[in-house]
């Protein structure tokens, strides 16, 4: 008879699904920092990790203000003239670190998605590698949560300072940033639940081995 997964493992799957979608939305969406839409004449609109949107941004490298950037563009856009020349302005050091840590989070989450599918579809507690699988999932998700936390803290400290995006007083953290915060908790909770599942299954296996040993000793005594 196949042993059932514990409640921790089943809840861990559900929380991981939430974490997965939070990470994906935060990674690809462009609303980490947004401008108040009620402000007329604002130069900045919104931005994410990989996309910047402007209403009318003057070229910061042009002292005569002859060129403006309008609309949403990928930060590595190769087609807009002059966009590569302001990349240092668009992607300062703190944003590079934010992108780095949240990219690690994204990759770890994708990796765990494959492992969670194995856990859900193919592995049962009877499988000899079940404990190792849950340990890897739990540890990786916990590390992903820590990496996401680092990304969020860095962006929170430096993302809305007055020396970066124009209209600082009217800018605020958007829904993408909120989703990134939610991803931290979802990742850490799901990682913790998978580690609890690991501990439960280890104890069950230890108890089963001890029971089997006692049974064998009793049989030998009777014989």
What are these regions (language model features)?
Residues 29-100:
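A surface-exposed beta-alpha-beta supersecondary segment
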Residues 73-81, 104-122:
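Short, charged N-terminal helix-start/capping segments
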Residues 1-48, 52-58, 169, 178, ...:
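Intrinsically disordered terminal tails
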Residues 12-24, 99-116, 133-158, 177-191:
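Alpha-helical transmembrane segments of multi-pass membrane proteins
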Residues 83-94, 120-133, 202-221:
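Cytoplasmic juxtamembrane regions at transmembrane-helix boundaries
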Residues 26-34, 119, 147-165, 193-197:
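Helix-to-loop junction signature of class
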Residues 59-75, 152, 189-201:
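Juxtamembrane/interfacial segments around transmembrane helices
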Residues 1-11, 87-100, 126-136, 169-178:
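Membrane-interfacial loop-to-transmembrane-helix junctions in polytopic alpha-helical membrane proteins
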């Amino acid at each position: 008879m196949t042993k059932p997964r514990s409640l921790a493992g089943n809840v861990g799957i559900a929380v991981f699904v939430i974490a997965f979608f939070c990470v994906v939305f935060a990674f690809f969406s462009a609303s980490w920092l947004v401008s108040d839409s009620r402000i007329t004449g604002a130069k900045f609109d919104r931005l994410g990790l990989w996309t910047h949107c402007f209403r009318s941004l003057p070229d910061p490298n042009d002292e005569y203000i002859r060129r403006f950037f309008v609309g949403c563009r990928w930060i590595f856009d190769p087609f807009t003239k002059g966009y590569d020349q302001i990349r240092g302005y668009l992607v300062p050091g703190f944003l590079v670190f934010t992108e780095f840590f949240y990219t690690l989070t994204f990759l770890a989450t994708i990796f765990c998605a494959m492992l969670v599918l194995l856990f859900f579809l193919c592995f049962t507690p009877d499988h000899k590698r079940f404990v190792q699988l849950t340990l890897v999932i739990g540890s990786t998700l916990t590390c992903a949560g820590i990496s996401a936390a680092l990304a969020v803290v860095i962006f929170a400290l430096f993302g809305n300072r007055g020396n970066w995006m124009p209209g600082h007083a009217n800018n605020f953290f958007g829904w993408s940033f909120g989703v990134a915060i939610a991803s931290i908790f979802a990742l850490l909770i799901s990682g913790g639940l998978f580690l609890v599942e690991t501990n439960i299954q280890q104890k069950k296996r230890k108890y089963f081995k001890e029971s089997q040993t006692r049974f064998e000793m009793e049989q030998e005594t009777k014989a």
